[in-house]
Amino acid sequence: MKILHLFSSKVFAGLERHVEELSYEQSKSHQVLVIGPERFKDKFRAEYIAINTNQWRYSPLLWLELRDAMARINPDIVHTHGQKMTSIIKADLHFSTIHGTKKNVAAFKKSQFIFGASKKSLEQIPQQKSMVLENWVDESRFNDFQQKTPEYFLYVGRFEPVKNPQRLIRAWSSDYGKLLMVGSGQLEEDLKKLIAELGLSKTIFIQSETNDVGSLLSKAHALIISSDREGSPKVLYESLYCKVPVLATNCGNISEVLPKTSVAENNDESFKMLIKKWVGKTDKLSSIQQDCFGKVMSKNLLSIQTEKVNIKYQEFLSMASK
């Protein structure tokens, strides 16, 4: 198969890593190309065509560039990620992925088949043209992983309103020990000010984002997710794969992955109580998440999830050839 992935983005986070890993795994047995912004070209292992997909969605230049590129490539399968590219692209065999939860899914409904990060992602999509595709772990990124003596609790993610990192800072206490928050985004300066205002500058530390998630997880007591909205967060699976327990708000598919006792309602008070309950009991937290560790290691691997996507592609190609 000749497969073309398209995305638009200004940061390299969960969606972008999803596209990178999926395209690379597919490239081992198929011809795969990715179209995306120039700034991410060096991060992709599959063949990459740089087009400024971040420009205005109604830009005539963008439409012309995409049309010409698709005509040259002549792909069997076109797979768009996110709402913008999905709304722009027209193709005979058009697959799309909803990576979070969307109020307006009209653009996705126009594609032949839709993958969703969680059941919530697909609530407005007919079942016959969709499937849940949970996120995965690229095992090759963790070949050298070794668990070390825990030093901190860990947040990994964008500093954006939807991730609500302020909720975590407000829930924290100097009695809980070190909290390392790794990421970047529009809220970064606001977070630093909030940390200072709450007198937590010697307890909460902000660090720039890194691709080496394994090194961060190797010294973590637990991963903490404070989001208002999620799809199927990649770092959730990576943490469980590394046998690092997770505390999180109830968003996306998190309640389908973690035990109820590890999940807070999506409000500040419930989240604060969850942190207080478990911060000194991470050994017990690990114990109750043993089944989660095992499930991720047996089912949520890149190779397994990629094969599900490829099989769905083949089904549609077979129908199209009849």
Which functions belong to the PLM regions below?
Residues 5-62:
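N-terminal strand-loop element at the rim of the active site
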Residues 13-21, 155-174, 182, 186-193, ...:
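A conserved mid-protein helix/loop that constitutes part of the nucleotide-sugar donor-binding site
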Residues 58-62, 79-86, 98-99:
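Short His-centered aromatic/hydrophobic patch
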Residues 110-143:
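Donor nucleotide-sugar binding/catalytic pocket of nucleotide-sugar-dependent glycosyltransferases
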Residues 131-152, 215, 303, 320:
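Acidic anion/phosphate-binding donor-loop and adjacent secondary structure
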Residues 209, 228:
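Aromatic "clamp/platform" in nucleotide-sugar-dependent glycosyltransferases that forms part
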Residues 245-248:
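Short hydrophobic beta-strand element within catalytic cores of glycosyltransferases
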Residues 260-269, 276-283:
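Conserved acidic donor-binding segment of nucleotide-sugar-dependent glycosyltransferases
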